[in-house]
Amino acid sequence: MHFKKLGIFSVALSGLLLAGCNNQDDSSATIEEKLNYTINGIEPGSGTMGLANNTLQDYENLNNWNLTESSTAGMLGELDKAYKNEEPIIFTGWNPHWMFAKYDLKYLEDPKKSLGEIENINTIVRKGFKEDLPNAYTIVDRFYWEPEDMETVMTDAQDSNFEDAANKWVEENSDTIAEWTAGVEKGNGEKISIISTPWDTEDASSHVIAAILEQHGFDTEITPVDPAIMFQAISTGNGDISLAPWLPITHESFYEKHKDDFIDLGENLKGARLGFVVPAYMDIDSIEDLAPKK
């Protein structure tokens, strides 16, 4: 298996006294003030950030709040720092993800459903893939797993890497793999391009399907790109398969733009979710509980 990574994207005493007078990070500051009216986001090209920006517009109390662009690693770093100090933080989160196993977290209620509800993750393939590689197509079409399976791979990858974690999952679930490959003739080194996105959820699914296909005689390459490029690659035939589309909300705009140019094989996972997430120690339960910026 090959893995291709693309590039995307002194102080005077009087000053100390003044800083002390203006510092709101004390027991009298509200949660919103301690947060600096800011929600921690991830990569700007993700569907999650588009929904998060819409949410700030949908809720009048959030109209003047800030949504910071970062990376998933950067967001997780901020979460870890805040959690260790029991400080408030609001961030864009989703599951399946190992963060929910490592930290005690909760979703803020979203009465307007601006961030969607339960999501599915679908499998799409380029037109002609079934005719060109019918055996691989059958395996890819049969691939379906549960959120707990994905989280297992994601968690194991924290102590190793996704290739090793995927191989471990495949080995431990040989009966399931046997069902997916039953009656399917082995490949002869045919190359299969897997287009993924740069997040742990898709790292997990892409590496697992790659491990299964490799085990069955195919040669795979995984390329992580932004969601817009992922849909474009499959639609133009520059990639063979993707297990990355989140539907019906997160990637809806990309899906609608290209839906006539690829084949949708349906869900490979049901029960995914995204939203605004906080540590369980924070005394807040809903987006509507947040005070507007003064």
Protein language model features and the residues they cover:
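C-terminal motif of bacterial Sec signal peptides marking the signal peptidase cleavage site
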Residues: 16-20
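A conserved helix-loop-strand patch within extracytoplasmic ligand-binding domains
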Residues: 26-40, 126-130, 137-138, 144-147, ...
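Short, well-ordered beta-strand elements
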Residues: 29, 33-41, 140, 188-201, ...
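Short helix-initiation/N-cap motifs at beta->coil->alpha
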Residues: 67-78, 199-200, 221-233
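Short, glycine-/small- and polar/acidic-enriched structural segments
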Residues: 204-218, 222-286
